[in-house]
């Protein structure tokens, strides 16, 4: 192959023609735009002006926090709250004439005819986060996006989807599921390209792209930008993107460049003028340096030392002044008069929208696809009513209707029919919405392709059969006959209709709750409190006739009152009669006591139907009004004064940091200074075996599929230098790091199979040994605690990882590390999450690195450490890593997508992987250049060597011809390396000849490097401090802990206060005692709001061997228990003192005690299920079933349970607490009147005092004994939770 043939692999390609219809051309004109954060009055972007004609590709460049994303958002009108802006932004429709001119390229013909110019102007926006459905394949995602955004024929849409798949290099993964953290699918780069495709499919005139190349390898990034350039040139589209690290050939594809630094414009003009402009002010781009990297370095402020910061800030100020002068004297912006006379288009009109019923059709089809591909949710959907119906039927199994207790049980089972199933569905559907559906809706709503009403209607249609109809039918079919209700078809189907409408109402309530807040802890609070009020108004717990007047009206707006009342009327009207006088029928008397009319059928059914529709209507209105937006970053003000410490002798802090690490008088450091570890991988293979249940009915229930991830990888990684693993997306780079660091985890449906050897200095080690001496920086930063600041995160990590140092030494090292990583400017900013914006993605990456750098390990693994970072920050991070290698002899291995050319030359060894994990090369950069030159692949001048090699090893799937030629090239390179390995006799050493470390010899040699966990007391104290800080800052967590329990007490007080001493008050006291079981659910919900984030952070710390399970568990309890105790005291104030139960010290403290214990048991159950399952939707479903069964078995609902169920009740805390509360509620000295009912024939009262009630209902218990037992039950719950966590992490390891 000649140099001419291979010289420019990236550009010698066959061009595709995309079948997009013509679009109107749009130009963008901005004048004096300034963007200010309204909360802090901080200027985020200062005086930005430009003219961008149609057919242009513009890039906004700059370091992290320079205002790139903010500028894009304002230009696209994506941020309204939290920001104010001055200046003008105008979109102008350019006059292109009715026919294309001769210079324009010819267009493809669709459906055999030439399409006219599209009338509707469309704008698209690619956000920084990829919001995709994990259970759709790549092709399905694009197909549904096309169906939602294009009003074209099926053939046209299919053609465009296939062309985009090829153009974006997604052909190899077109039928792969997108996946998520739990179920791996597409790589990060593939997801990014797919997101670009979902926006491009709408055929936009103007498109904004926020970091489109983040996570892409250099070759994929180049092809994506090349596609944008082609679309701009051919169709006159306008593309505006923010970009971190454009390779040099990407830079020269751009038409216009804007460089920002700290919100100030450093340059904003045509790309052709960029280099001459900087040369004119004295800055010449050095040879063999990417101009983009040079310009970003030039305009960045280096905050790693005071001296550097002052110098670079001064240079930046000079650059800004130069640009203002140039803009005023040389830049020729179009006159305002021209813009004013042109046709201006409002951005609100630049959205795509199908007719309503087409939206509904597409969304329904997608929902069906998603629902039936989610096996776990589908199974639980049908299992839940089956289990809960069976157990509920067993609890209330055919009660004796001739006794008072039996009739009370019958009433309770009717209440359970209306409330139980629909409440469980409310919780489940709320979580399913928060976890899966609403994020996709928010993205599509922001794009203008979906309306709230279409979303709600489509979702309801798709879930109607499986959820509303099937779940209700299963539940009613089981419970109706087990309850021993009348075998009448009309009554059976009427009960089905009532329960069906109740579940429909709860479905609407869940939609309303999520419309109010996308955060589950808030949405569940809305749903829970609403449902609690509605269940209180149903008339079962507190008699609807005698409710306090100020809440009596609630029954008329409570669908539960209508549903419970109509079932009571259907069951008891003219029933249990012993005489012809209907008024004396026991059933009619019960209806009279509860205040429901006889034969009350039609009206409540109609009202129920109205409520079921009404909740959805209110939810739709809130969704229309409440478009989700992200708030501006929050800053936590430090209480301490900021003391700037000057570096002695002007030494840079990162050098001081490195000196501190090993020059302190620490025995570990002195020993470790000279340890050098050469890592050798021999014949590493990795494959994953997928077991897909129910995927192919013909082949059986399970379908097995094997995927090769790594194949015979042999590599050497040397100490004292950075070793890089390079390759295109999907080549197994991250998988190799996970394998050698012992972080591969098999699941039920995906088993990893590995083989090969890992050597330390030619002696074989196990994965566990490797893990003990290495630190691993993962690609994912989601485990960071959102409520902590940067400084706090590193401070707490240092306290646990550097426990051999004094506090002053730890603080100094933390401060130095913050400066070294360039985080000084945001050290007091919170980390943030998807709901509250904190630091940028690049800054999160550096925080994660900082935590691991504190460990000071001999081996450091980093997965994509520069992904999402600007070139200046990337260079800074790699400079820090290089110093660690050089001065401390560490072995550092990184995976990297787009290394700068000057950094690539400084790498130690490079492992180049092709797709499917096959080795293309392993050696030094100089050896690499020489090797590929021998193969005939000479790197052209002014080309980044790393980019060139990545281009060589990448397969271009944009069209068949490109694919054939690129695959042949890749196969040739792979075959050549295999032959080279064989010739050099580098085959692996036979297993029998390998030296292997024993466990003892390894720990003897590397004992000073094996991380020793912090002692229990220290880890406990640090965990308490950290969790206290996160709880204090997180309003949601605090409210979940403190507000929900007293909130219930307030509601109970509203409905029950004052509890009287008459016949009706008996059922009210029973109801109030039964309502205390709701605290079981509150404990679980509090756990769901607080525990998962703490758990995820703890798992990372545990994997790093920082501390054990006990400190985390005890610290969590230390914060949880006092807050629960405080909430329980407030609860008792409302339920005992306000409601008017016996106001004695014994009753008050017994209520505090019982409510505290029940809440703690709910928390413990939450810990158990959150440990078993990491998927919260499944957790909610499982735990809700357990809790519901527990509350139904409390002993106050069903008064005649079987002996087996009574046996289960021994470990049911609410079984004990309900009995304690009811015995204190009916003391022997409580005198009852019977003017309103309950008189014997001789005129005496059936229940003269509290003891009579307890005896009659069989509720007399030894309260002292029960008070002792429930402590034991609570302790048993906690111990079970602890041992389940221990089993997960230490014993079984699932």
Swiss-Prot record:
Protein known as: Uncharacterized ABC transporter ATP-binding protein/permease YOL075C
PANTHER family the UniProt entry points to: ABC TRANSPORTER G FAMILY MEMBER 28, ROA1P
Topology with respect to the bilayer: Multi-pass membrane protein
Binding of ATP 1, residues: 62-69
Chain ranges on the Extracellular side, renumbered to this chain: 1-375, 517-530, 626-1038, 1142-1266
InterPro entries tied to this protein: AAA+_ATPase (IPR003593), ABC2_TM (IPR013525), ABC_transporter-like_ATP-bd (IPR003439), ABC_transporter-like_CS (IPR017871), ABCG_dom (IPR043926), ABCG_transporters (IPR050352), P-loop_NTPase (IPR027417)
Organism domain of life: Eukaryota
Intracellular or extracellular location(s): Membrane
Gene Ontology cellular component annotations, sorted alphabetically: cell periphery; fungal-type vacuole membrane; membrane
Family, per entry: Belongs to the ABC transporter superfamily. ABCG family. PDR (TC 3.A.1.205) subfamily.
GO biological process: transmembrane transport
SUPFAM superfamilies attached to this UniProt entry: P-loop containing nucleoside triphosphate hydrolases
Pfam entry (one): ABC2_membrane_7
Record-annotated ABC transporter domain positions: 28-287, 679-941
Residues that carry a glycan: 41, 86, 101, 151, 341, 349, 371, 528, 983
Protein residues bound to ATP 2: 727-734
UniProt keyword terms in alphabetical order: ATP-binding, Glycoprotein, Membrane, Nucleotide-binding, Repeat, Transmembrane, Transmembrane helix, Transport
Membrane side Cytoplasmic: residue ranges: 397-495, 552-604, 1060-1120, 1288-1294
Transmembrane annotation, as ranges: 376-396, 496-516, 531-551, 605-625, 1039-1059, 1121-1141, 1267-1287
GO molecular function: ABC-type transporter activity; ATP binding; ATP hydrolysis activity; ATPase-coupled transmembrane transporter activity
């Amino acid at each position: 192959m000649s140099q001419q043939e291979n010289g420019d692999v990236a550009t010698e390609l066959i061009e595709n023609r995309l079948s997009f219809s013509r679009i109107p051309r749009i130009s963008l004109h901005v004048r004096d735009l300034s963007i200010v954060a309204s909360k802090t009055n901080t200027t985020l972007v200062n005086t930005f002006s430009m003219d961008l004609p149609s057919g242009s590709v513009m890039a906004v460049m700059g370091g992290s926090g320079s205002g790139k994303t903010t500028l894009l958002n304002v230009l696209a009108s994506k941020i309204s709250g939290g920001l104010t802006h001055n200046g003008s932004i105008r979109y102008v429709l350019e006059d292109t004439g009715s026919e294309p001119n001769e210079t324009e390229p010819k267009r493809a013909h669709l459906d055999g005819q030439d399409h006219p110019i599209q009338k509707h102007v469309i704008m698209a926006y690619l956000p920084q986060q990829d919001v995709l459905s994990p259970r759709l394949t790549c092709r399905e995602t694009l197909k549904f996006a096309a169906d939602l955004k294009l009003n074209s024929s099926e053939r046209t849409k299919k053609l465009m989807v296939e062309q985009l798949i090829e153009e974006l290099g997604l052909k190899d993964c077109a039928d792969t599921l997108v996946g998520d953290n739990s179920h791996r699918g597409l790589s990060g780069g593939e997801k990014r390209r797919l997101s670009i495709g979902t926006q491009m499919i709408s055929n936009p005139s103007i498109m904004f792209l926020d970091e489109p190349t983040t996570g892409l390898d250099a070759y994929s990034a180049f092809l994506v930008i090349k596609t944008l350039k082609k679309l701009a040139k051919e169709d006159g589209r306008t593309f505006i993107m923010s970009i971190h690290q454009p390779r040099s050939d990407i830079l020269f594809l751009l038409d216009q460049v804007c460089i920002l630094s700290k919100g100030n414009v450093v340059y904003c003009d045509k790309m052709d003028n960029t280099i001459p402009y900087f040369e004119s002010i004295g800055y010449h781009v050095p040879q063999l340096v990417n101009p983009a990297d040079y310009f970003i370095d030039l305009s960045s402020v280096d905050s790693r030392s005071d001296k550097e910061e002052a110098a670079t800030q001064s240079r930046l100020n000079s650059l800004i002044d130069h640009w203002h002068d140039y803009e005023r004297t040389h830049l020729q912006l179009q006159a305002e008069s021209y813009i004013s006379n042109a046709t201006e288009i409002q951005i609100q009109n630049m959205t795509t929208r199908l007719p309503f019923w087409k939206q509904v059709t597409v969304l329904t089809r997608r929902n069906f696809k998603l629902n039936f591909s989610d096996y776990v949710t589908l199974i639980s959907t049908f299992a839940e009513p089956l289990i809960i119906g069976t157990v509920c039927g067993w609890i209330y199994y055919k009660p004796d209707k001739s006794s008072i207790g039996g009739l009370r049980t019958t009433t309770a089972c009717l209440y359970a029919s209306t409330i139980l199933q629909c409440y469980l569905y409310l919780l489940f559907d709320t979580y399913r919405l928060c976890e899966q559906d609403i994020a996709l809706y928010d993205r599509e709503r922001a794009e203008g392709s979906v309306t709230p009403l279409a979303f709600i209607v489509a979702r309801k249609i798709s879930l109607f059969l499986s959820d509303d109809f099937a779940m209700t039918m299963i539940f009613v079919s089981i419970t109706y006959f087990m309850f021993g209700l009348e075998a009448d078809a009309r009554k059976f189907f009427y009960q089905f209709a009532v329960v069906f409408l109740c579940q429909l109402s709860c479905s609407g309530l869940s939609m309303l709750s999520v419309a109010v807040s996308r955060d589950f802890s808030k949405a569940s609070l809305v749903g829970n409190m609403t449902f609690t009020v509605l269940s209180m108004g149903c008339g079962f717990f507190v008699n609807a006739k005698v409710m306090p007047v100020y809440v009596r009206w609630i029954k008329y707006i409570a669908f539960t009152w209508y549903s419970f009342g109509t079932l009571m009327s259907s069951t008891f009207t003219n029933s249990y009669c012993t005489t012809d006088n209907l008024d004396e029928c026991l059933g009619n008397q019960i209806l009279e006591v509860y205040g429901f009319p006889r034969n009350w059928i039609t009206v409540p059914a109609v009202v129920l139907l109205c409520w079921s529709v009404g909740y959805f209507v209110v939810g739709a209105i809130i969704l229309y009004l409440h478009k989700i937006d992200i708030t501006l970053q929050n800053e936590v003000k430090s209480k301490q004064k900021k003391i700037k410490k000057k570096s002695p002798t002007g030494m840079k802090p990162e050098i001081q940091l490195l000196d501190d690490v090993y020059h302190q008088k620490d025995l570990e450091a002195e020993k470790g200074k000279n340890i050098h570890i050469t890592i050798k991988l021999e014949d590493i293979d990795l494959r994953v075996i997928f077991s897909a249940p129910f995927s192919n009915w013909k082949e059986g229930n399970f379908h097995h599929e094997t995927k090769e991830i790594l194949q015979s990888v042999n590599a050497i990684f040397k100490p004292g230098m950075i070793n890089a693993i390079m390759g295109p997306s999907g080549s197994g780079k991250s998988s190799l790091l996970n394998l050698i660091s012992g972080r591969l985890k098999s699941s039920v449906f995906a088993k990893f199979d590995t083989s090969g050897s890992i050597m330390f200095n030619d002696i074989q080690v196990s994965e566990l040994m490797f893990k003990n001496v290495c630190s691993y920086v993962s690609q994912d930063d989601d485990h960071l605690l959102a409520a902590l600041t940067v400084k706090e995160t590193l401070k707490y990590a240092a306290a646990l990882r550097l426990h051999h140092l004094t506090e002053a030494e730890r603080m100094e090292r933390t401060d130095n590390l913050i400066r070294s990583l360039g985080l000084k400017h945001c050290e007091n900013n919170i980390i943030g999450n998807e709901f509250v914006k904190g630091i940028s993605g690049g800054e999160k990456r550096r925080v994660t690195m900082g935590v691991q750098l504190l460990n000071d390990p001999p081996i450091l693994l980093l997965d994509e450490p520069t992904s999402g970072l600007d070139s200046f920050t990337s260079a800074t991070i790699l400079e820090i890593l290089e110093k660690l290698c050089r001065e401390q002899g560490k072995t550092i291995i990184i995976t990297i997508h787009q290394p700068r050319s000057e950094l690539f030359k400084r790498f130690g060894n490079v492992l180049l992987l092709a797709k499917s994990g096959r080795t293309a090369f392993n050696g030094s950069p100089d050896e690499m250049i020489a090797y590929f030159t021998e193969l005939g692949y000479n790197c052209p001048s002014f080309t980044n060597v790393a980019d060139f090699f990545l281009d060589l090893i990448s397969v271009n799937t944009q069209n068949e011809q490109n694919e054939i030629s690129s695959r042949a090239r890749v196969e040739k390179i792979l075959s050549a390396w295999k032959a080279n390995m064989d010739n050099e006799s580098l085959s692996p050493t036979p297993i029998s000849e390998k030296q292997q470390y024993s466990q003892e010899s390894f720990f003897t040699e590397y004992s000073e490097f094996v991380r020793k966990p912090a002692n229990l007391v220290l880890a406990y104290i640090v965990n308490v401090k950290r969790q206290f800080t996160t709880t204090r800052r997180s309003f949601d967590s605090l409210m979940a802990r403190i507000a929900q329990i007293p909130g219930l007490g307030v509601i109970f007080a509203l409905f029950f206060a004052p509890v009287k001493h008459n016949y009706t008050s008996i059922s009210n006291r029973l109801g109030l005692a039964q309502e205390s079981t709701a605290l079981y659910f509150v404990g679980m919900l509090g756990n769901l709001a607080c525990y998962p984030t703490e758990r995820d952070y703890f798992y990372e710390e545990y994997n790093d061997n920082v501390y054990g399970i006990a400190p985390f568990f005890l610290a969590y309890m230390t914060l949880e228990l006092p807050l629960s105790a405080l909430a329980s005291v407030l609860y008792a104030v409302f339920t005992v003192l306000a409601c008017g139960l016996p106001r004695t010290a014994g009753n008050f403290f017994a209520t505090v005690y019982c409510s505290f214990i029940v809440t703690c048991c709910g928390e413990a159950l939450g810990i158990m299920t959150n440990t078993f399952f990491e998927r919260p939707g499944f957790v909610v479903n499982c735990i809700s079933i357990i809790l519901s069964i527990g509350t139904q078995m409390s002993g106050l609902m069903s008064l005649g349970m079987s002996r087996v169920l009574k046996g289960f009740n021994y470990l049911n805390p609410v079984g004990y607490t309900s009995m304690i509360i009811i015995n204190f509620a009916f003391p022997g000295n409580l005198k009852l009147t019977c003017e309103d009912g309950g008189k014997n024939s001789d005129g005496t009262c059936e229940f003269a005092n509290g003891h009579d009630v307890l005896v009659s209902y069989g509720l007399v218990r030894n309260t002292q004994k029960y008070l002792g037992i429930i402590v034991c039950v609570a302790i048993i719950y906690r111990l079970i939770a602890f041992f389940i966590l221990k089993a997960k992490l230490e014993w079984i390891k699932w």
